[in-house]
Design a protein with these regions (language model features):
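Structural signature of FAD isoalloxazine-binding scaffolds in flavoprotein oxidoreductases
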Residues: 60-72, 194
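Histidine-anchored nucleotide/phosphate-binding helix
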Residues: 91-105
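Hydrophobic alpha-helical positions that pack around
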Residues: 123-210
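Gly-rich Lys/Arg/Thr-decorated short loops/hinges at beta-loop-alpha junctions or inter-strand turns
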Residues: 14-19, 72-84, 181-186
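Terminal amphipathic helices with adjacent charged low-complexity linkers/tails
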Residues: 1, 110-123, 128, 146
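Conserved phosphate/anionic-ligand binding catalytic regions in large, soluble enzymes, centered on
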Residues: 40-59, 153-165, 169-170
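Iron-sulfur (Fe-S) cluster-binding modules
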Residues: 1-41, 108-113
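Short coil/turn connectors at secondary-structure junctions
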Residues: 7-8, 32, 40, 64-68, ...
Length: 210
């Protein structure tokens, strides 16, 4: 496996972030205010559908459910595609803290990185980064448990409803919408499903502004 196949990089790989400081900033700013900033930034889902990220988080936040979930779709199945692999391999903490930010904003307490089976070699690195995040958020008073879940190689599981069915132990098949995952997602609970790159951009926006 080459150490890097990326010839040109941007803030995703270059920028260092003080994640605790960013979370303090957002906690001081307020959840609704940050959602509006995320909407103003124009960030859309980077997985292909292009749904406004701020609106998705706003919809999940508005749901009156004690159980909500954050899912990172890292089931990168397009032939020749390795964007998510590079981000997870070289900027995993940005992904994890982007998910933590989403959890804080929406009120979710649990999340999963759904990762393609071929990327299992990353799990040790990812679990170390997850453990570090979970230790750091204790001082912030944030409760968020994050785990890894591996796919079985089905291309269709890159689609969010098929991915959720797979996570629940069912055959990974997509379903008609509505209902949407923001209201009836994982375990039929409100769920944010965003792509790897989307979560990274969210934490960068949290630090730099819209």
């Amino acid at each position: 496996m080459p150490t890097s196949t990326v010839k040109r990089t941007d803030l995703i790989f270059k920028k260092d972030i003080d994640y605790s400081a960013v979370m303090h900033k957002i906690m001081k700013m307020g959840k609704d205010e940050f959602i509006e900033e995320l909407i103003d930034s124009g960030l859309r889902g980077r997985g292909g559908a292009g749904f406004p990220t701020g609106l998705k988080w706003k919809l999940v936040k508005a749901e009156q459910s004690p159980d909500k979930y954050i899912i990172c779709n890292a089931d990168e199945g397009e032939p020749g595609t390795f964007k998510d692999r590079e981000i997870l391999d070289n900027a995993a903490e940005k992904v994890i803290w982007g998910m933590t930010l989403a959890a804080y904003i929406t009120g979710a307490k649990e999340g999963f990185i759904y990762i393609r089976a071929e990327y299992k070699y990353m799990q040790t690195k990812l679990r170390i980064a997850i453990d570090r995040m979970e230790q750091n958020i204790k001082a912030l008073g944030i409760k968020f448990k994050l785990d890894l879940m591996f796919g079985a190689g089905a291309y269709i599981c890159g689609e969010e409803t098929a991915l959720i069915h797979s996570m629940e132990g069912h055959r990974g098949e997509p379903t008609n919408k509505p209902p949407f995952p923001v209201t009836h997602g994982y375990l039929n609970k409100p769920t944010v499903v965003n792509n790897v790159e989307t979560f990274v951009n969210a934490i960068i926006i949290a630090e730099m502004g819209a």
